[in-house]
Amino acid sequence: MDPHDNSLENSGDGLSVPEPADIQEPPKNRVKVASDDYPQWLLPPIAPPALTEPPGDTPPLLPGNSPPPIFAPKKVLTDEVSPWMVVGLVGLMGASVLGLFFDGEFGCLLKGSWNACLFTTLAVLAYLGRERPWAQWMSWLMLSGIVTLAAFLNCGLSLLAVADDGRGFFIRGTYEASVVMLVLFMSWACLIPALLPALRRSPLGIARLEEAAGWTNIRLLALGTTVSLTLSFCMPLLILGEPPILAAMQRSARFAADMTGNRGAAGLLRDNLYSLVWILLGAVLAVGMGIRRDANQTLDRLGLQRISILRLGVAVLLTALLLGLGELMDLGITRTWQAFGWKTTDASAINALFSSYFTPLGAIVIGVTAGLGEEVAVRGILQPRLGILLSNCFFTAMHAYQYHWDALCSVFITGLVLGLIRKKTNTTVSAIVHGGFDFVLILMAIPKGD
């Protein structure tokens, strides 16, 4: 047998196998192919590249052929927008616009939607921005506008607080003008913390740490909004050294009348009810109803659950305990402030500011509107996403226009208790406790004989 003849010969009863001494070592990187039609040693076959789409009727890839084109996968939006969400948002925005053109009771009803419209639209844009870049940038632009509006509000209140005529048209001198401009500048500078997350997410070199830790655009926007507005609401108190609304009331006896206008006590109570309706409508949209959640999921996200008899009894007991804690807390805070000689909240000015609510009907309305509205907005929307501490700081800052630091300290501690109640139970229970707490405080403030 020729030692160089490596072919396999057919015999009548099978294949004849060469002797081991006659078999040459195959070259490296080659595979053996036993066939009568092909050489015995071939290069390894070329594996076809992975395809991003099924090949379908594409012929098999042969050596020397160019690979088929690679198609990018189609992007499918998972956040589908429900028509009900569109109807609710358009209705809210339409009411806000029409409120500029209508007066009377109907106009007051429409004007009550302004606050809810701003924050609801911001939240909806944040949800849409999860998969739509235009909505993400629109949400950050809208946040910039909201903080700018808050800065001008602070400027106006500060102007009323330092004006020499009590109406804000004139100021006494350069010092007062400098104070007002400082309030405006520092309030607008509160926008910087809100934009820092957006800058980190820009194409200028981000590490996507927020996404890795679960910090989606929605949570970043909620964080920026809460921090910026918390600082902005406190800015007049920090710079002026006193709450701007109380300072304006002390300078002008007409200020309280100007705030109520021609609405009267009954009109103010109706305005609170109007605002509550719009807040509840905005809340269900702000947590993604019609985008990420259905009705049941929305109520669960807000913590609004059916109250049982047992939970109702627990809420009443917690209300009584919170009232007792409030009395001890106010006593301790007042003595601490007096010991250090710090300025406290003017009780007479507070009573004059809220005198329109010092009736049994006013106590009921405030208990319902403040309890339900604030709990849904703060403990229902913000707390599950940002936690108790940060959401409670925002809740406390909302009262900085009329309360001094001693009263804000009391509000902060009360808010912490309500936040713990919300965490251990639900928003329904915390709303009952909050409403009952405010109801009793208003009843206790009603002058004797009324």
Predicted regions and their residues:
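Transmembrane helix-loop-helix hairpins at the membrane interface
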Residues: 2, 33, 37, 42-44, ...
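Low-complexity, Pro/Ser/Thr/Gly/Ala-rich intrinsically disordered linkers and tails that serve as
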Residues: 11-24, 29-31, 35, 52, ...
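Hydrophobic alpha-helical transmembrane segments and adjacent interfacial helices
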Residues: 93-99, 144-160, 225-238
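Alpha-helical transmembrane segments of polytopic membrane proteins
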Residues: 107-121, 171-190, 267-280
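Canonical alpha-helical transmembrane segments
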Residues: 118-136
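Juxtamembrane helix-loop-helix connectors linking adjacent transmembrane helices
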Residues: 172-174, 206-278, 287-369
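Membrane-water interface of transmembrane alpha-helices
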Residues: 183-205, 284-295
